Amino acid sequence: MVLSQLGSSLVTALRKMTSSTVVDEEVINTLLKEIETSLLGEDVNPIFIRQMVNNIKKKINSEDIPDGIDKRKLIKDSVFEELINLVDPKTEAFKPKKGKTCVLMMVGLQGAGKTTTITKLALYYKNRGYKPAVVGADTFRAGAYEQLQMNAKRAGVPFFGIKEESDPVKVASEGVRTFRKEKNDIILVDTSGRHKQDKELFKEMQSVRDAIKPDSIIFVMDGAIGQAAFGQAKAFKDAVEVGSVIITKLDGHSNGGGALSAVAATKSPIIFIGTGEKVNEIEEFDAESFVRKLLGMGDLKGIAKLAKDFAENAEYKTMVKHLQEGTLTVRDWKEQLSNLQKMGQLGNIMQMIGLNHPMFQGGNIEKKFKVFMVILDSMTDRELDGSAKTMLNDESRIRRLARGSGRDIREVNELFEQIKLFQQCIDRLPKAMRAQLGNCNAQPNEAAMMQQMQRMLPKGVNQAQLQQLMKQMNAAGLGGTGKKGKK
């Protein structure tokens, strides 16, 4: 996870406070000192930390706490709120709309990962039903044209560039004009970077901006620079009216917290963070969701948004229909597994849910799902359109699949047992509850749903985790039997 060491330190500090026999001034001061030390270790500006600590102290002043108020909960809530304030610029960013062309101009220093981020962003939007295209207007860096062209091809998105052209304004203008005609709804324009901020760089960016008139300018910056991000983000914002920021390389450095808080202080909205080198390792940034995952609280908002994106695809609707009818096919399972992998890392999805059971651990489940996909890719159309139960009853097919996929017979059996178990879980639901599968407008009856789900989950998942998972299912459109609203 991004900033996992910081998250671990903060969680440990809060647990110490919670387990204290008496929460007095000494316990509170120890907690705040540990939080301060943890944030300093992430290169967060000491001024920001001091302001945060003072805000927490004001909220938990013992003299102002009424009788009957849970002091431990008040302290935890105050820390949670102030951590959000630390990384939240409280400024809305531009959001593209499907079917309406928008031009996004990408700027940043050389080495920040701008060209790679453009590809990640294009694939992110492509997987959510947009028609993105990329324009290679970085005419300064050697190899920029070839890198973006190759990345775009791998991501399956259109690319425009003029290899021998040295004028970035001409390339950007022609690229935007071309993709407007082709009705692409997101046009991502790569621009030249430099090793440092200089007048020449800003002048070139301003010329490109004036020529293509972007709907938003996105500044891509390296998270490794820590609190120095404040000056860098402010300089770019003042030069070309940066509309939002993407912070890269947050997975491998201890300065990420400093970068996030510094950018937030410039009032520039952070829209995405880079979480790894892979093309799908980019996350939409939301301050509350980020802090929830940091503290291991689960991210209801994030999983609900993911579920909304997920539920819009036609394959999902087909799967819901088959689940309701009790006719789930192996192909349904394969398509949804593929969609999950496109939407983002499975480990990140498990963090959103906030479950710590071994079967839900990110690394384990990603490795397992990759094995499952290898097996599924070895199946014939006839086998894919059949049921898991049919496959389990045919030992010769199981052996053939194991040989064809290069996997163990045990792994092949495990795949079909998982699919079979999933269908059985749905079959155990009452008919009224099953009828609401996929209905995002239904209001769930949580008590009834909890009783039904207790038999479905593995041992070791506690009541709180079960309730949280149930909320996620409702957010995903796997709702309960509550009454529908009036039409």
From Swiss-Prot:
The NG domain, also named G domain, is a special guanosine triphosphatase (GTPase) domain, which binds GTP and forms a guanosine 5'-triphosphate (GTP)-dependent complex with a homologous NG domain in the SRP receptor subunit SRPRA. The two NG domains undergo cooperative rearrangements upon their assembly, which culminate in the reciprocal activation of the GTPase activity of one another. SRP receptor compaction upon binding with cargo-loaded SRP and GTPase rearrangement drive SRP-mediated cotranslational protein translocation into the ER. The M domain binds the 7SL RNA in presence of SRP19 and binds the signal sequence of presecretory proteins. Belongs to the GTP-binding SRP family. SRP54 subfamily. GO terms for molecular function: 7S RNA binding; endoplasmic reticulum signal peptide binding; GTP binding; GTPase activity. It catalyses: GTP + H2O = GDP + phosphate + H(+). It comes from the Eukaryota. GO terms for cellular component: cytosol; endoplasmic reticulum; signal recognition particle, endoplasmic reticulum targeting. It is found in: Cytoplasm; Endoplasmic reticulum. Its EC number is 3.6.5.4. Pfam families: SRP54 (PF00448), SRP54_N (PF02881), SRP_SPB (PF02978). Gene3D superfamilies: P-loop containing nucleotide triphosphate hydrolases, Signal recognition particle SRP54, nucleotide-binding domain, Signal recognition particle, SRP54 subunit, M-domain. Residues 1-295 are annotated as: G-domain. GO terms for biological process: SRP-dependent cotranslational protein targeting to membrane, translocation. Keywords: Cytoplasm, Endoplasmic reticulum, GTP-binding, Hydrolase, Nucleotide-binding, Ribonucleoprotein, RNA-binding, Signal recognition particle. Component of a signal recognition particle (SRP) complex that consists of a 7SL RNA molecule of 300 nucleotides and six protein subunits: SRP72, SRP68, SRP54, SRP19, SRP14 and SRP9. This is Signal recognition particle subunit SRP54.
